[in-house]
Amino acid sequence: MTSATKTNNSGSISSPIVVALDYANKDAALAFADQVSPQDCRLKVGKEMFTLYGPELIRDLHQRGFDVFLDLKFHDIPNTTARAVAAAAELGVWMVNVHASGGARMMSAAKEALLPYGAQAPLLIAVTVLTSMDSEDLRDIGITISPAEQAERLAKLTWDCGLDGVVCSAHEAVRLKQVCGEDFSLVTPGIRPQGSEAGDQRRIMTPEQAVAVGVDYMVIGRPITQSPDPEKTLREILASLTKVA
């Protein structure tokens, strides 16, 4: 029932960096993958690229030795979400996610769908509050508490459902580790090396700051993918993390 194209979920890759493959075409994405080492990072495939190129892109990245985070943020009725998560497991991805706001029944169904895969199941994480959202954005959709409070509420629900962790802002990391435990994985977008533009992220941190507050995996896109020398930039970020006490 497990995929033959699976790379690994054993933790043999120690890098906390997940590079977002936000490219307009597959050739550009694969050209980038050929410039960096799978020992230095994992790769994230999101909605745009997966919609355009589908499972073939995942297989191409697996053939190059990369672990893949399939970032599709499933949010649907429990049965549909469970089937989608199982389909991701069949692809052999390292990590897959759902929206925590889909509720406990949806998240529990997704978790149960991965049980037959045992140790080969992908990590299943939930999105709390998008890092592009601030308090005003939450008020617009009827949520009157702060992004941090909403993230904590949804993280607790995710933990109760037995998922492996959450996608959250690095600003919530310390509190979420306290609430959900050290083994609860925190995956954070909105990470920008010093001097990088914020782009469309509003709640950002540097890689060093993120590691210091307990982030397990940091998603970094344009600062690496648009670098003239992506591997050099990646290595520089990794080197900076070794200095974090």
UniProtKB/Swiss-Prot annotation:
Please tell me where substrate binds in this chain: 22, 44, 71-80, 131, 192, 201, 221-222
One GO cellular-component annotation of the UniProt record comes to: cytosol
What are its E.C. numbers? Answer: 4.1.1.23
Its keywords, alphabetically, are: Decarboxylase, Lyase, Pyrimidine biosynthesis
Cysteines paired by S-S bonds: none
Task: Please give the function described in this protein's UniProt entry.
Answer: Catalyzes the decarboxylation of orotidine 5'-monophosphate (OMP) to uridine 5'-monophosphate (UMP).
* Subunit architecture: Homodimer.
Protein name as it appears in the record: Orotidine 5'-phosphate decarboxylase
Q: What is the gene called? A: pyrF
